[in-house]
Amino acid sequence: MSEKRILLGNEAIARGAYEAGVKVSAAYPGTPSTEVSESLVQYDEIYAEWAPNEKVATEVAIGASIAGVRSMCVMKHVGMNVAADPLYTAAYTGVRGGLVLVVADDPGMYSSQNEQDSRMVARAAMVPIVEPSDSAEAKEFMKYAYDLSEKYDTPVILRSTTRLSHSQGLVELEERVEPFDIPYERDMAKYVMMPGNAIKRHVVVEARMKQMAEDANSLPINRVEYNDLSVGFITNGIAYQYVKEAMPQASVLKLGLLNPLPRKLIEEFAARVDKLYIFEELEPVVEEQVKSWGIKKAVGKEIFTVQGEYSANLIRERVLGQVSQVDKAAKVPARPPILCPGCPHRSVYAVLNKLKIHAAGDIGCYTLGAVAPLSVIDTTICMGASISTLHGMEKAKGREYIKNWVAVIGDSTFMHTGINSLMNMVYNQATGTVIILDNSTTGMTGHQDHAATGKTLKGQVVPAINIYGLCRSLGIEHVCEVDAFDQAELERVIKEEVARDAVSVIITKAPCALLKGIKFPNKCRPLPDKCKKCGACLRPGCPALTKNEDGTISIDETMCNGCGLCKQLCKFDAINLVKAGE
């Protein structure tokens, strides 16, 4: 007997993997994809892991596929760049057990450094990509993706977006189907991509895509809804929901398979409607192909933006000419994103700011060190780039140029792609200083474990990678660990290491203030009679502190966790540490 539940899109994707008989999953956390892997933990039949990065995760999934079982890897859109190397070659080798890459794009860049469109990667890699429009489809499309993968001997990408991943919908749960484990047979010509084999496999890939393009015209995930023929929309994913909301009587061609496109189906649809709109978020992937076929009536990015998320109001405004009736937002004080109360990164940045040291930044909570009042991060490119960026600066301008620079990187990001960058500094005789902000978690995406925390995705306790020992093993003589909240020691060590003519690493250690199980026995309490109204305690921007009208400060004890940073900064002993509850 089936059961229905309300699930997030990401939860539905995980459920689809379970019902499809997936046995192995690997991922690196990244919003908006993270909950897919976290939702897999409940299924004992699936081995699920956090890998150090998306390339490794993809290779793990490929290995499981070659062994003959259904497998998957999960990542956000920028993670696809890291996974590109194995993905492009896996398109040539094909699969044994079904292989699906779940990729979550981020229109609007709610938590990302760019707005790239994974459909373009699928075209370049010559692999099919499917995209659901709600939670129910997310589950079903996941199962269908495995059928496509095994039928056409190819990896398949399932694309989600932030709005789909984090929206809820009603999903009918079904039983798991255990697929037959395919016996292993050595096939060097298929799986060993030396040039002679790869040349032949490229021919196979081209033939496969040609066959899929023909079959796409009759696939059930490409659906035509004929209604009012005066206007028609070609759309996909969450954008389909906006079309149905804004113009429910319009005819719609809903594309579930975005590569390859069903040309015959599209041409037939275009011929039957008077006006044709192509409504797709981000890049004109469908539009460019449709127009290349000579369908001149198609209208897309001429009126719809390539930036950000779409909405039903966008259709009402651009197609119907309506003025959207949107209530004006109340005027409230701006609340820019800031580090949490008690965040150890704030303490480190307070010292860097005091010493007027610039930082090459990386991806994580600590990117917030770029904004006022801390204002120490000058660059942020991608995962692991802080170390390489600092190295490039030194090689371009010399040692003197970086004497007031450091690279800052989190523990999880260091494990992701920072190690190679640090190795490069050692190998090529750099002299920069790297600060590893070790808060014992992958903080920004929701406190996931990694190789240096000693715990797996499934909660198994394992030996933790020792970051100090790892850095020393690279041949770095000057590696030190410092309490992230010890302002005096931080200042001393940073001054010493930045002046050193050799690669050095400072590991600042203190757990993320939001980690479960972290105890905060103390609170900070101001002493107004001693306060000199200098504002030194306010400079790091802790949200628990506010300035009173008379120039003294107040500390919100519901927010304060007693990290003691403000107390250390006060030269007049105008802040006390007290036991929580006193």
What are these regions (language model features)?
Residues 106-155, 161, 192, 196, ...:
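Conserved thiamine diphosphate
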Residues 1-135, 163, 226-227, 287, 370-507, 517-518, ...:
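Thiamine diphosphate
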Residues 39-45, 243-253, 469-475:
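Short helix-loop-beta junction
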Residues 36-39, 62, 83-87, 109-116, ...:
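Short acidic, glycine/serine/threonine-rich loops at helix termini
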Residues 45-52, 93-104, 186-189, 427-440, ...:
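A glycine-rich helix N-cap at a beta->alpha junction
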Residues 2-10, 132-339, 344, 348, ...:
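Flexible, low-complexity linker and terminal segments
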